[in-house]
């Protein structure tokens, strides 16, 4: 199985195994699964429902966190970014870090 298909299948399995905390998470889970299963371009930011990542980074004591300035929103934010054609979202998150 090619890398993109393998990463997509792994992501689908991980999200299917996710237990939503509330109704909103249940809805979000279905939206994400629908995009992953039906849109071959869901890893491109041009897709209406596209994949992106976020990382919440803390130090070993959990007392400090790493944030970045978000120019569009003019505020501090956790780190993240669009997949831009990469289905391995862990790799995308690490790229942003």
What are these regions (language model features)?
Residues 1-21:
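N-terminal leader/capping segments at the start of a protein or of a new domain
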Residues 51, 61-62:
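Short, well-ordered loop/turn elements at secondary-structure boundaries
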Residues 62-96:
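Conserved Nudix-box catalytic region and its N-terminal flanking loop in Nudix hydrolases
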Residues 14-54:
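Acidic, metal-coordinating catalytic segment for phosphate/diphosphate chemistry
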């Amino acid at each position: 199985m090619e890398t993109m298909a393998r990463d997509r299948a792994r992501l689908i399995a991980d999200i299917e195994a996710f237990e939503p905390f509330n109704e909103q998470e249940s809805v979000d889970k279905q939206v994400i699964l629908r995009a992953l299963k039906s849109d071959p371009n869901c890893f491109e930011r041009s897709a209406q429902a596209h994949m992106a990542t976020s990382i919440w980074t803390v130090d070993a004591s959990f007392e400090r966190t790493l944030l970045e300035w978000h120019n569009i929103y003019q505020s501090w934010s956790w780190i993240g970014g669009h997949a831009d054609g990469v289905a391995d979202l862990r790799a995308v998150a690490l790229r942003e870090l």
